[in-house]
């Protein structure tokens, strides 16, 4: 086996018709996410349905349909392998809750792949003012996804035109610069997700294309390559935050006969291990971790990115709930937030938002109404400079620093300290109306806490 490859998470963004499903499907199909048996089954069905040409997008549709029917698809289907990395495609595009998922995200993306349709008229529609592409790119940037790859798709429909590719690179560079990316650090790859050109192998249809090159932090020589897979391999590896204090937002709490209470969630930062005394915020319960397991196997420790279940003693299912955050009681334990200040970007709200507005916030696994108690300042989205102090209201397209007060106990953190607990989506009218990044949190001890016997014993042992 050798050493396991490093993992990277990519999110694929772009306009509905950019061909991102086909491209993602092709990547997963060719790079090993889907086992041969499943492919044969799909191909047979495709042939029977007269989709004999077998569209890669159809693979993705099948996976998505199964996922939406609530059949949990083995997440490996969304994985593919490149020479250097194990790649997980975080959320297949076109998914209804795409924006919410990106924020409360099952995991933070290390890189975004922006798929642009090269066809005449298509490109222009994709990045027009109200375009989805713009919203997705803005979202990725706001949420701290700093690495970007641009794939110019459907080159086959442009007769593999170099002039068209160059025109799109120029326009897209301006476009992503406005969002906040530096085009010099971005690989631009002309592809056909349908025919496979420049996906894994250099295309013979575009002899004019000499490859991409991008600046790399801390290196005087640029990174270069030919294909989309090369570009994925040139992603700078992420640093996983295992040296930070523990933060583990609960997704569920189970009661398991003969074992007891088992909270389940993803380790976002730090490490959880048996014997540790954890406290849950904002529930204010402290207890000892008896065991940690993942996929029904006991673990010596759970690391960032691991989805774990852990058994806690003397805590009932009524004491803790989804949205609570587990942390190490001896190392910067998590606390309830009395209020917090955040930079909010309004994406699509039909009216104007003023003080008193109280939508639902989705932050990590918490889903709680919060009141905009004060609009502190309106700022320039790109530079962060103040444009107006104490504005009366903000509207779509605006960025502002606001003070938020949760309607029920809630635990959040500043984005700088604990990124996964410091970004949120503002939901109203069944859509995401704004996204935010938390600047600072005013913490409170909350109501009287419960410390279990086992926690006291464990503390004495230490």
From Swiss-Prot:
CDD domains: EF1_alpha, EF1_alpha_II, EF1_alpha_III. Residues 70-74 are annotated as: G2. Pfam families: GTP-eEF1A_C (PF22594), GTP_EFTU (PF00009), GTP_EFTU_D2 (PF03144). The modification N6,N6-dimethyllysine is found at residues 3, 318. It comes from the Eukaryota. The modification N,N,N-trimethylglycine is found at residue 2. GO terms for molecular function: GTP binding; GTPase activity; translation elongation factor activity. Residues 5-242 form the tr-type G domain. Keywords: Cytoplasm, Elongation factor, GTP-binding, Methylation, Nucleotide-binding, Protein biosynthesis. Residues 91-94 are annotated as: G3. PROSITE patterns: G_TR_1, G_TR_2. Coiled coil: none annotated. The modification N6,N6,N6-trimethyllysine is found at residue 79. GTP binds at residues 14-21, 91-95, 153-156. Residues 192-194 are annotated as: G5. Residues 14-21 are annotated as: G1. GO terms for cellular component: cytoplasm. Its main location: cytoplasm. SUPFAM superfamilies: EF-Tu/eEF-1alpha/eIF2-gamma C-terminal domain (SSF50465), P-loop containing nucleoside triphosphate hydrolases (SSF52540), Translation proteins (SSF50447). The modification N6-methyllysine is found at residues 3, 30, 318, 392. It is found in: Cytoplasm. InterPro entries: EFTu-like_2, G_TR_CS, GTP-eEF1A_C, P-loop_NTPase, T_Tr_GTP-bd_dom, TRAFAC_GTPase_members, Transl_B-barrel_sf, Transl_elong_EF1A/Init_IF2_C. Belongs to the TRAFAC class translation factor GTPase superfamily. Classic translation factor GTPase family. EF-Tu/EF-1A subfamily. HAMAP family: EF_Tu_A. This protein promotes the GTP-dependent binding of aminoacyl-tRNA to the A-site of ribosomes during protein biosynthesis. This is Elongation factor 1-alpha. It comes from Serendipita indica.
């Amino acid at each position: 086996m050798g050493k396991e490859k490093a993992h990277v998470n990519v999110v694929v963004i772009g306009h509905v018709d950019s061909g991102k499903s086909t491209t993602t499907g092709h990547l997963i199909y060719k790079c090993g996410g889907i086992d041969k048996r499943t492919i044969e089954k799909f191909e047979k069905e495709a042939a029977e349905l007269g989709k004999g040409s077998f569209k890669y997008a159809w693979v993705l549709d099948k996976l998505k349909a199964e996922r939406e029917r609530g059949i949990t698809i083995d997440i490996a289907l969304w994985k593919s392998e490149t020479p250097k990395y194990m790649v997980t495609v975080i959320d297949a595009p076109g998914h209804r809750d795409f924006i919410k998922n990106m924020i409360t995200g099952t995991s933070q993306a290390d890189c975004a792949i922006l798929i642009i349709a090269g066809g005449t008229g298509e490109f222009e529609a994709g990045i027009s003012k109200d375009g989805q592409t713009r919203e997705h790119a803005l979202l990725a940037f706001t949420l701290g996804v700093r690495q970007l790859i641009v794939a110019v798709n459907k080159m086959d429909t442009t007769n593999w035109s170099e002039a068209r590719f160059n025109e799109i690179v120029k326009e897209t560079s301006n476009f992503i610069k406005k969002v906040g990316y530096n085009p010099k650090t971005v690989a631009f790859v002309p592809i056909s997700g349908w025919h496979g050109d420049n996906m894994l192998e250099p295309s013979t249809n575009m002899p004019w294309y000499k490859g991409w090159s991008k600046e790399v932090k801390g290196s005087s020589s640029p990174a270069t390559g030919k294909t989309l897979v090369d570009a994925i391999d040139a992603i700078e590896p992420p640093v996983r935050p295992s040296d930070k204090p523990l933060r583990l937002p609960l997704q569920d709490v189970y009661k398991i006969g003969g074992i007891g209470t088992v909270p389940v969630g993803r380790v976002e930062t730090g490490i959880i291990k048996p014997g540790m005394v954890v406290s849950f915020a904002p529930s204010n319960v402290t207890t000892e971790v008896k065991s940690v397991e993942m996929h029904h196997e006991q673990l010596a420790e759970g690391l960032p990115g691991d989805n774990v279940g852990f058994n806690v003693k003397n805590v009932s299912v009524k004491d803790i709930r989804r949205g609570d955050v587990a942390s190490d009681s001896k190392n910067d334990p998590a606390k309830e937030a009395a209020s917090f200040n955040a930079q909010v970007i309004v994406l699509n709200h039909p009216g104007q938002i003023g003080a008193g507005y109280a939508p639902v916030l989705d932050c990590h696994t918490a889903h709680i109404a919060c009141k905009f108690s004060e609009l502190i300042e309106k700022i320039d989205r790109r530079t962060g400079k103040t444009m107006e102090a104490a504005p009366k209201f903000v509207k779509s397209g605006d960025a502002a620093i606001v003070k938020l007060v949760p309607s029920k106990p809630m635990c959040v953190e500043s984005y700088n300290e604990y990124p996964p607990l410091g970004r949120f989506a503002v939901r109203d009218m069944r859509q995401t109306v704004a996204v935010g990044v938390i600047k600072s949190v005013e913490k409170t001890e909350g109501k009287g806490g419960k410390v279990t016997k086992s926690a006291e014993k464990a503390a004495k042992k230490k």
